[in-house]
Curated annotation (Swiss-Prot):
Family according to the record: Belongs to the short scorpion toxin superfamily. Potassium channel inhibitor family.
UniProt entry keywords in alphabetical sequence: Disulfide bond, Ion channel impairing toxin, Neurotoxin, Potassium channel impairing toxin, Secreted, Signal, Toxin
Principal location: secreted
Subcellular location: Secreted
Molecular function GO labels: potassium channel regulator activity; toxin activity
Protein name in UniProt: Potassium channel toxin alpha-KTx
GO cellular component: extracellular region
Function: Blocks voltage-gated potassium channels.
Tissue expression per record: Expressed by the venom gland.
Cysteines paired by S-S bonds: 29-49, 35-59, 39-61, 44-64
Signal peptide interval: 1-21
Length: 66
């Protein structure tokens, strides 16, 4: 009985960790450097910048720690 409870708790913990690893933050930035600073401050491992309209950039920060 105790081993089943421990296994269930481990499975729940692993699901929570996977969800946190895939956390995504978006923000509007002025340029790529601003985007890089924003993602770094959130503790993100990856970033992607895309230009929405000429002066505006959208920053996608991927795999962030909370």
């Amino acid at each position: 009985m105790n081993t089943k409870v421990v296994l269930i708790m481990l499975m729940i913990t692993s699901v929570i960790l996977v969800v946190e690893a895939e956390t995504l933050f978006t923000a509007n930035c002025l340029d790529r450097k601003d985007c890089k600073k924003h993602c770094k401050s959130k503790g993100c491992k990856e970033m992607k910048c895309e230009q929405i309209i000429k002066p505006t950039w959208r920053c996608l920060c991927i795999m962030c720690s909370k």
